[in-house]
Amino acid sequence: MGEEEKKPEAAEEKKMEEKKPEEKKEGEDKKVDAEKKGEDSDKKPQEGESNKDSKEDSAPAAPEAPAPPPPPQEVVLKVYMHCEGCARKVRRCLKGFEGVEDVMTDCKTGKVVVKGEKADPLKVLARVQRKTHRQVQLLSPIPPPPPPPEKKAEEDKPIVEEKKVEPPVVVTVVLKVHMHCEACATEIKKRIMRMKGVESAESDLKSSQVTVKGVFEPQKLVEYVYKRTGKHAAIMKIDPPPPPPPEEAAAAAEGEKKEEEKGEGESKGEEGKDDKAKTDEEKKEGDGGKGEGEAADNGGGEEEGKVVEVRKIENPYYYYYYQPPRVAIPPMEMPPHAYPPQLFSDENPNACTVM
C-alpha cells in the first residue's frame, strides 16, 4: 500500500517541475512588454512638450502678406509704321488675339509692345506679319534655338544604292517641214532653238528640211514644231538611231534563238520532206486542172451577168424647171412644158405643106 501511494505523488512532482520553467518564461515575456510600454510612455510626453514649444514660438510671428502677381509677359516687335493709321491697324489686328491683354505702339521707333501672360511670341509675330504684309522682327523674348537634328534617324534610314546615270545621247534629226519663203525658214529655226535640249538648228529652204542637233526625243520635237509654228513636220532621218527599249530587246533576242533552233530542225527534216513534197505537187496538179475548169464555167457567167450602172437619169425629160419653195404642204408636181410641135411650122422645111 505504501508503494502505491508514493507513485501518484512522484507523478505530481514531475508535473510541477515541468510547469515551473513555463511560468518563468511567461514572467520574462511580461517584463519585456512592460519595459517597452514604459519607453513609449516616456517618448509621448517629450513629443507633446516639443509640440507645445513649437506652437509657442510660432504664435508671436506676424502673418506674411501674399506675394504680388508677376508682371505680364511683354513681347516686343519691330514693325515699320509711317503714320498713326498703320499703328491703329497693328493694334486692331492684335485686339482679342489669344493671350494678348494690352498692345502699345510707337510710330517713331517702330516698336510694338504686346502684354499678356499666355501670349505666344511666334504666333503674335505671324499674326502681325500676315495682317500687315510687312517684315516683322521679334526683339524680345528671343526664341530658343531649334534642337539639333537627331542622328539616329539618319542612321536608321536604309542605304539607297546610287543608280548609275548614263550620259545623255546627242541626237541629230532631219525634219521635213513645208517652207515657202526665207521668213518661214528663219521663224521655224528660231522656234526650234527655244526648245529645251536643242543645241543647233539649220534650215534648208530648197529641200524644205530642218536639221536639229541636241538631247531630246524626236517625237516631242515634232509635237513642239506643230504647237509653236502650226506646221506639220515629218521625221526623215535620225542619227544615231534610238536604242530599242529593254523589253523589245529581250523579245528580239529570244526570237533570234528560236529562229536558230528552227533552222537546225529544218535542215535535219529537209531530206525526209523531199519525197512528200513531190507527191503533194502531183496531187495539186491533178486537182488544179479540175479547179480551173470549174472556175472558168462559173466565173464566165458571173462576169457576163454583171451590169455596172454609171449614171442614172432621174428626169426623163431634157429640160429643167425651178424647184418649188419648201412649205408645210407637200408640193404638187407641175406638168412639164413641151416644145411646140414642128408639124405645121413655117420655119421647118420638112413640115406639112397642105394647108
Swiss-Prot record:
Residues 1-74, 132-157, 235-308 are annotated as: Disordered. Keywords: Lipoprotein, Metal-binding, Methylation, Prenylation, Repeat. Residues 353-355 form a propeptide. Efficiently farnesylated in vitro. A metal cation 1 binds at C83, C86. The keyword Ribosomal protein does not apply. Residues 1-58, 254-293 have a biased composition (Basic and acidic residues). A metal cation 2 binds at C181, C184. It comes from the Eukaryota. The modification Cysteine methyl ester is found at C352. InterPro entries: HIPP4/7/8/17/18/19, HMA_dom, HMA_dom_sf. Residues 72-136, 170-234 form the HMA domain. The keyword Lipoprotein applies. Residues 63-73 have a biased composition (Pro residues). PROSITE patterns: HMA_2. Coiled coil: none annotated. Belongs to the HIPP family. Heavy-metal-binding protein. Binds zinc, copper and nickel in a reversible manner. This is Heavy metal-associated isoprenylated plant protein 7. It comes from Arabidopsis thaliana (Mouse-ear cress). The gene is HIPP07.
